């Protein structure tokens, strides 16, 4: 990271969106994760809490993640809720994420008729010097 030596710090935010709001049982819900104003992003993560009666996690489709490793975790909490933790990290020296782009798609299957109201929380962007920017 020569970039980080100049005192540059990680910036930006991630937003999630779906093509529509209502999904029928067994329909695939594609949640687009878009980055805006990204600077020096070497790792990213956020939480997406969901009700396992509503959704089943199918997978992640990387779009603009360069050489980042997908370390996403789908976790069942003791209170019965589930949270998906989409997480991508550069292992070793790889190009950081910059600018504005569609980063990846989270694929969920609707287990019954649902209105998509999930929100990303606890978002973190990290640079090569481990500076953290929350969103």
Language model regions located:
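Acidic, low-complexity intrinsically disordered segments
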Residues: 1-135
